[in-house]
């Protein structure tokens, strides 16, 4: 007859007790962490209901530093970045004249938008062999006919405009009510023929001074303007007398279709000017942002326009620039304010670009709008 060993039962009971104590301790620590986090979150949440704080106040300097201490996007979780950005919204943004001036001086040395944003008769004389931005495309010879398409000189000069709005097409603009604030800017840049009339005007405004056109739009939607041209002309008319800007010298594929836009508007006796990005400017801008950590096969049109605006305008405001599937509050949004068509993967580095803008906002160089607007 076998007898159970009482000490074995005691050991088993002791092990279970230790396990129970460990589980309870772990649960208690987790609960305390949640309570402490909740207090911090609640504190930050209620800060949004106070009067806006001055951008250079002690609290705002702390919040700005929380953004600036993140050197690269991979350092923090997306949710943590959003939380830091939301907290900063209690601060009334103000331009830091010293930071902005320093940044603009570096752009002047590297890129020089007032002289090289567009091809002009001054910077691209007749008989020039103009190198494409994509160097493998070779050179384009500027003959007398093409030379006549160029303006005599750049139509804009350094810090010509007091306040500029660069309007991206992000879904963050939907239900923002930012239309009036965008319209109140002295100069407005837009990207790639976005819809601005009807249901969109309240959120995105309608004032447009420069609108870019990606030649792929003309190729895919308007059959290279080889046949019917009026549908494309009608689209451009929505922007009234806005200048039309194209990357004719990015590569060979873009050149002829970009020239056709100029020919078409001349045929219709339109007052809309047509300009072409200078490939030297595009190359310089790409190298500049690469040196600051924006690595992409090609930087976005939005980033190019922001770069130009920083030289041409005293104060730059960004609307519709957001590259995440959720807004800062964690709600899912569409990719564009007018559709949910995603870009080709791996072509642009949009999250990196937006992260760079958030850091520039925190430094007082430009302002990024990601919430609702209460203007005018």
Curated annotation (Swiss-Prot):
Its EC number is 2.4.99.-. Keywords: Disulfide bond, Glycoprotein, Glycosyltransferase, Golgi apparatus, Lipid metabolism, Membrane, Signal-anchor, Transferase, Transmembrane, Transmembrane helix. GO terms for biological process: glycosphingolipid biosynthetic process; N-glycan processing; oligosaccharide metabolic process; protein glycosylation. Substrate binds at residues 192, 214-216, 300-302. GO terms for molecular function: alpha-N-acetylneuraminate alpha-2,8-sialyltransferase activity; sialyltransferase activity. Belongs to the glycosyltransferase 29 family. This is Alpha-2,8-sialyltransferase 8E. It comes from Rattus norvegicus. The keyword NADP does not apply. The gene is St8sia5.
């Amino acid at each position: 007859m076998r007898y159970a060993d009482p000490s074995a039962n005691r050991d088993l009971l002791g092990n279970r007790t230790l396990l129970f104590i460990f589980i309870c301790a772990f649960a208690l620590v987790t609960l305390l962490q949640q309570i402490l986090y909740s207090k911090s979150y609640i504190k930050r949440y209620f800060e949004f209901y106070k009067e806006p704080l001055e951008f250079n106040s002690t609290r705002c300097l702390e919040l700005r530093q929380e953004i600036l201490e993140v050197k690269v996007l991979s350092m923090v979780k997306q949710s943590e970045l959003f939380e830091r950005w939301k907290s900063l919204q209690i601060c009334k943004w103000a331009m830091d004249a010293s930071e902005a001036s320093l940044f603009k001086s570096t752009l002047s040395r590297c890129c020089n938008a007032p002289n090289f944003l567009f091809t002009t008769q001054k910077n691209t004389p007749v008989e020039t062999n103009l190198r494409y931005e994509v160097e493998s495309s070779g050179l384009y010879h500027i003959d007398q006919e093409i030379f006549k398409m160029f303006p005599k000189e750049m139509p804009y000069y350094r810090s010509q405009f007091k306040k500029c709005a660069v309007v991206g097409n992000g879904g963050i603009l939907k239900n923002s009510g930012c239309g009036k604030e965008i319209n109140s800017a002295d100069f407005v840049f837009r990207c790639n023929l976005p819809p601005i009339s009807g249901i969109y005007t309240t959120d995105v405004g309608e004032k447009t001074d420069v609108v870019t056109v990606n030649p792929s739009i003309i190729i895919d939607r308007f059959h290279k303007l080889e046949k019917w041209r009026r549908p494309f002309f009608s689209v451009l008319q929505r922007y009234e007398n806005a200048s039309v800007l194209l990357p004719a010298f990015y590569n060979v594929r873009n050149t002829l279709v970009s020239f056709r836009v100029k020919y078409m508007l001349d045929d219709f006796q339109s007052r809309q000017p047509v300009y072409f990005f200078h490939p030297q400017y595009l190359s310089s801008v790409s190298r500049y942002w690469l040196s600051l950590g924006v690595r992409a096969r090609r930087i976005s049109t939005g980033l190019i326009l922001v770069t130009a605006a920083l030289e041409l305008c005293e104060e730059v405001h960004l609307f519709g620039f957001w590259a995440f599937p959720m807004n800062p509050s964690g709600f899912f949004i569409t990719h564009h304010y007018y559709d949910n068509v995603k870009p080709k993967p791996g072509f642009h580095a949009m999250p990196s670009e937006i992260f760079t803008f958030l850091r520039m906002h925190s430094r007082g160089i430009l302002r990024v709008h990601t919430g609702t607007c209460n203007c005018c």
